[in-house]
Structures are given as structure tokens and as C-alpha cells.
Amino acid sequence: LKMGAMFVLLLLFTLASSQQEGDVQARKTSLKSDFYRALRQYDRQCTLVNNCDRNGERACNGDCSCEGQICKCGYRVSPGKSGCACTCRNAK
């Protein structure tokens, strides 16, 4: 009887652990898609005037300016658009 009860408890614990792992993976996927969605919205606000990487692609320290916005040159990592870029946000 003791062995049977221990087996059932072990089985329940294993099932609960795998469910938690699935929840964590689902949350990671959701966070990643939210992050990329935010990046796309952030990019839409920028009107690029000068080229960030004109002083050398590795330096990523060229001039970056946006009309009526706060901007900086930096490395952007997103699907299909990675590299040095001007990131801007509205001045509030």
C-alpha cells in the first residue's frame, strides 16, 4: 500500500512539473512576440534623416536625427532587420 501511494504521489508531482514547464515556455513565447511587436511600433515613429553607420558599420556611431523626436544610433536585433540603426521615440 505504501509503495502504491508513493508511486501515485510521484506521478502527480511529475505531471505538475511538466505542466509548469509548459506554462513557462508559453509565457516566454508570449513575451518574445510582445517584444518584437513593440520594436515594430518603435521603428514606425522614426523619420531617419542621416545614416547611423556612415562612420563605419562596426562603430555604429554616425549621425542620427529625427524630426521632433529623441534619437540614438544603436544595434537593432529583429527578424530580417538586424544591424546598426537609428532608434527614435517621440519627445514628450
Curated annotation (Swiss-Prot):
GO terms for cellular component: extracellular region. Residues 1-19 form the signal peptide. Keywords: Disulfide bond, Neurotoxin, Pyrrolidone carboxylic acid, Secreted, Signal, Toxin. Contains 5 disulfide bonds. It is found in: Secreted. Expressed by the venom duct. Residues 20-44 form a propeptide. The modification Pyrrolidone carboxylic acid is found at Q45. One of its GO terms (molecular function) is toxin activity. Belongs to the conotoxin S superfamily. The cysteine framework is VIII (C-C-C-C-C-C-C-C-C-C). This is Conotoxin Ac8.1. The lineage of its organism: Eukaryota, Metazoa, Spiralia, Lophotrochozoa, Mollusca.
